[in-house]
């Protein structure tokens, strides 16, 4: 199997022991780690906690993949999207510092978490507002809108396609189709990750496994059709060894 670029995501802080466990089950070190961002005021370990996580991730050259977390809001209107987009972007910028992010290139992906059931199905209006809210947070840092979702969530992909048709950007998709029995290393499978309907946005990542086999991480694989460094990792955030902000 060709070289694989893989990563993890969790709803709790990254530790040295967790990285060791993840590397053991993945077969290679994770190149990125997905963590949640919602608002600068949100507390709790579900959110990224840089005072705990920055140094350990930096020591292993693991980049942070920001996930925008307000799953029950994503079917709302433009105003809700604007509010959440501004809050998500402000959280990322306040966490790492605007000047630091500018020094690291100033342009990064952020993935909107759409779980594909109940209230968590995307609306065109919400996505349009969310993208606008992201852009309002800073004149110096660009957070590029991406979407995490389920391949079969037709309501979400239809809504996103409408937004794209009206010129609203989407920089990429992270598709969740977890496997239940397959062993590592897992190979990319286009048939399992294609959104239905297809909207033309690039599929960057496949979340192919939830916690199992003794590993308490979600696992994701980078699409081998893209250049992992240039097309994905360059747009994820390298955490600083030390950072003064809360």
Locations of regions flagged by a protein language model:
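Polar low-complexity intrinsically disordered regions enriched in Ser/Thr and small residues
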Residues: 30, 88, 100, 152-155, ...
């Amino acid at each position: 199997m060709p070289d694989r670029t893989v990563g993890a995501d969790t709803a709790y802080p990254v530790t040295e022991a967790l990285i060791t466990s993840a590397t053991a089950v993945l077969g290679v070190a994770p190149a990125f780690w997905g963590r949640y961002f919602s608002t600068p005021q949100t507390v709790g370990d579900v959110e990224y906690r840089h005072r705990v996580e920055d140094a350990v991730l930096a020591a292993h050259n693991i980049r942070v993949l920001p996930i925008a977390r307000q799953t029950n809001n994503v079917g709302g209107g433009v105003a809700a999207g604007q509010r959440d987009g501004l809050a998500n972007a402000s959280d990322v910028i306040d966490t790492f510092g605007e000047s630091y992010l500018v020094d690291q290139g100033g342009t990064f992906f952020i993935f909107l978490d759409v779980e594909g059931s109940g209230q968590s199905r995307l609306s065109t209006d919400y996505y349009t507002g969310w993208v606008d809210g992201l852009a309002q947070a800073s004149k110096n840092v660009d957070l590029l809108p991406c979407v995490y979702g389920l391949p079969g969530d037709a309501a979400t992909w239809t809504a996103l396609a409408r937004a794209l048709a009206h010129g609203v950007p989407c920089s990429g998709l992270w598709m969740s189709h977890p496997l239940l029995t397959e062993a590592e290393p897992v190979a990319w499978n286009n048939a399992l990750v294609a959104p239905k309907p297809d909207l033309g946005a690039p599929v960057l990542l496949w979340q192919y496994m939830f916690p199992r086999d003794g590993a308490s991480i979600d696992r994701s694989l980078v699409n081998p059709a893209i250049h992992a460094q240039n097309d994905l990792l360059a747009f994820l955030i390298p955490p600083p060894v030390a950072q003064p902000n809360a």
